């Protein structure tokens, strides 16, 4: 049998190239669709507090304020993003991958504030039972929560009187929510560390217990061993990066929580800069900065605690690092929104993981009279490559 060489005609060759280009184009578009991350970020929901004034009413409970915010979140996916040169500008949001809340679920139980048990039940009602958020594929959005200083103090005690003296309900609730296969009925801060990670569309999310102190960094080091240096990493914690001395373990005496020293023992690391709260946190922050220098793929730090919207850069005590920081408002204790309810805000974070562009948009969720209407506020674009 004689073999013949096959030489495709010009028409056949052109058609084949067209099919190949169409396939490559469709594949690229499919990958592009998968490269988008959308998540909502809020913090300091403080169940147990009341708001002096909200939507024409006085002394409005956190349950009602937070429920109003949740209603706006639930309808956000149908909204069109503004023409602001950000990721997905002028396009419908379409889906929310996750709702992230960085702590202070329950307010500290001082001066007649309700118990953490009551606050956790209200949290479940608002952010679990009334949560209708879903991803672009129709599946339910993840709810990702870490504790704040109020949650931890309710569980371990405080240097001022509380009633009751301890109630770990929100710490137990957060732990069981995030570790459903290892549920607990009591809480021990030395055993039940609330830290975990998630991989979402090519980004590694790390969720921390209050602050990345030396103990958290040991766990983070192990977690990051499985992550490529080219994978962007986001950190989520309650505390500001320039952490306050009171968060650390009391360096004095038997290292307990007491009225004289007023350290809160919120993280395991013992305070080193001084013996009282008048000191700095230079040593503690430098430990974190060194960790950042060892892991340059840590790109963004999300936090609450100080309760206003700000997108800024953390430089460290020696001005030798540059970490993008996203600070968010509190629906109950906002430094700005407390006086002007139209400034109440949460953040919508959108990233294209192929281009490496991250867009953060402030959602002014109470700026209009409609119960589910909002205005866009601050906006920032970051290139993470």
For the regions a language model picked out, list residue spans one by one.
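N-terminal active-site segment of His-dependent metallophosphoesterases
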Residues: 28-115
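Active-site glycine-centered loops adjacent to acidic/histidine catalytic or metal-binding residues
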Residues: 44, 103-104, 148-149, 238, ...
